């Protein structure tokens, strides 16, 4: 794991419920935790290619928290709204409750589902994480039966 990602993961695990994301499946055998680490890694790769003045700390932190909704979206619940349209808001609410977020981190979390949700990101970091999220979701979904080799997590994801 990149140093900035490792450092940020350690801080989020120490100060909030970040580790709980390991319990929830995201795409195939990938946990939400694995997915968020993959998105942070891909966002850094995109940022390196794009260049320019970017807040790399906010980029990584927002990427790691973009799916901080903390529930199993594969299990239907009658009172829970449609996951695709509402999980970004739930992730943002949980992240605000557990962490102090910068405006850039809030933008990343709230708008990563563009264009499914029609409000686009306002920051370059938000656009990068939105793109990284879609790239990782596609890769994870298409390799859904493959064990996760992209993160250091050793436990088998349900």
Named regions from a protein language model:
Residues 1-158:
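Metal-dependent phosphohydrolase cores
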């Amino acid at each position: 794991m990149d140093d900035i990602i490792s450092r940020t993961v350690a801080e989020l695990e120490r100060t909030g419920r970040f580790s709980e994301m390991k319990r929830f499946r995201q795409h195939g055998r990938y946990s939400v935790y694995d997915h968020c680490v993959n998105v942070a890694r891909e966002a850094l790769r995109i940022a390196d290619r794009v260049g320019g003045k970017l807040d790399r700390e906010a980029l990584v932190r927002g990427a790691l928290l973009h799916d901080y909704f903390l529930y199993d979206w594969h299990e239907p619940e009658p009172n829970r709204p449609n996951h695709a349209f509402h999980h970004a808001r739930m992730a943002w609410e949980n992240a605000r409750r557990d962490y102090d977020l910068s405006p850039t981190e809030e933008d990343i979390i709230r708008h990563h589902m563009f264009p499914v949700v029609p409000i686009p990101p306002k920051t370059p970091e938000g656009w990068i994480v939105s793109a990284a999220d879609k790239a990782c979701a596609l890769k994870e979904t298409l390799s859904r039966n493959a064990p996760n080799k992209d993160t250091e997590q050793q436990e088998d994801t349900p």
